[in-house]
Amino acid sequence: MIRTLSIIISIMVMLVSCQTNVVEEQKIELKNQLIGLTSAHNARQLGGYQIGSRRIKDNLLLRTAKISELSKEDSTLLCDKYKVQCIYDFRGKEESLSAPDVIPGKARYLSLALSFAGSESESDTKFENEQQMIGMLLQYADHPSVQAMCTSMYDVIFFEELSQEVYRQFFADLLTVKPEDGAVLWHCTQGKDRAGSASAMLLAALGADRELIMADFTLSKDYYDPMTTKIKTETELQKTVMNTLISANPVVFEATLDKVDAKYGSLTNYLTECIGVTPEMMDVLRNRFLE
């Protein structure tokens, strides 16, 4: 009897021990990732994300919307707190020329121009403000080019050769960066599609699973949704445009990731086959940016 009781107690102790060793599921919240900028939208970091038994180092990997209106205070913050050493600009040439980046301190600037057909103003059409641009998108919500953007934007990013070349340049430069010299910052116009895809690829290279990649992408929706709910939409097509082009649409993004998996097996395989990021390069990135 005593021996049986002893065995039961031992099993209970083992069970309790196992339970206390379980890693709690990480809770990804927008407020925890924001980096304190007031003059740039969707400004956050990848730092703090748990990947297996390791985590991404804080204050090194920053992602934002355009920084063409960066305030003096925010520029100082990026210099003093984050020591930003390099800016990666994924906006198209026309976007960058019409609203040049405000470069914090002596940060190096690299243009990684990526534009979509009809997504940037290569014509004579100019918008005085974002409200005017939003109004135009909603007005032409049923136009084939606008609808194509809604359904195939991420396919263009992941599968078009010109887009892949842009992300090859991103990783090639990132591999030259020394974390001890400070953070890197990448952005596009809204910091959700081109910059968001860069974040997804980098997270995959660092060993993140689909759940974390999607959680990070969805933070853009969490950021923009409070703004878009104030904008009136009258049709389902307008709602689709609002959710995809002005906010962020995780469903459309994940559909592209599913296509990547179907064709290449995984996002990491895609990185190796299409972007040229070898397993050895991934190890370098993990050693630099994980702790």
Predicted segment positions?
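Cys-dependent protein tyrosine phosphatase-like superfamily
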Residues: 18-185, 197-291
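Bacterial N-terminal signal peptides
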Residues: 6-15
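Positively charged n-region of N-terminal signal peptides that target proteins for export
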Residues: 1-4
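Ser/Thr-glycine-rich phosphate-binding loops at phosphate-binding pockets of nucleotides
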Residues: 190, 194-195
